[in-house]
Amino acid sequence: MLDTRYALGTQHVLTNSRGRIAGKFEVDGVLTDASGNVTVTVVDTDGTMLVDSQTATQDSTGIYYYDLGTAHTTRVRKVTVTWSGTWESTSQSAVLEYEVVGNFIFTESQARTFDDQALSSTSSYTDEAIADERARITDLLFDWTSLSWIPRFYKAKLKGEYSPELLLPHRLVNNLISVTIDGVSIATSKFELDSEVGVLYYKEGYFTQPTQTYPLNIVVEYEHGYKSVVDGVDRIGLKMLRMRLPVSNIPENTRSFTDSLGTADFIVEGQGPFGIFNRTRSPEVNAWLEQHSASIIGW
């Protein structure tokens, strides 16, 4: 059975980069080469074919990559990639979704030099491992604060209410990519955007109500999120990385630990005293999350 996963830390790729995407292919848990070429087909969220059955390059056993090229990384976007090849004498395909983002919350170099430099070893902690964990942390911070801390793509499918105003699902909307109403593409110049609160104004018409043909009749593609690293999110991300990657002999649900130096108390993730919910075991990270989550309550 073929199992396909992200490889080389390419789940997130930067805008204006070569756009390298990679996949690792395992048969029964073992990295396995394809018999012959592996091809790549890349489709944008609107169905546009960006890459059609091009040959991927082999990096190492069972790992293949393809460079999208700068033409396809000029803006944030999500792409669906189909990897196709022959394994176990059978033609097989696997689909992964990759994201072009406008920034990273921290770099591999920062990760290796942070704090006590616990991640300095490139053999113990590869760039791939750091990049994969960074992508997970980026998603966690978005889930926990309802704000994106890097520029990201989103495609919203909404119902119009016959109003010139439309509330988008996110704050900090940087720019519009496309707007479609009842299946008709409308020039983005016809709209005004309140970036801070995520409200879109139609200057020359109304966002019509849905129909049976178009039940979600308003489709808006946009970039949202902070354009640069702000409010110390890089430090928060690095502290989370420091807690998540290095192996510890202390079980994660340990509440206290006693040795010759005395007893140390630990914060446990989950419900704490006085109704406090701890997202992590770090007081600093938890305080930062509480501050930045509270800032959007009531919005």
Regions found by a protein language model. Name each.
Residues 55-58:
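Short beta-strand segments within Ig-like beta-sandwich modules, predominantly Fibronectin type-III
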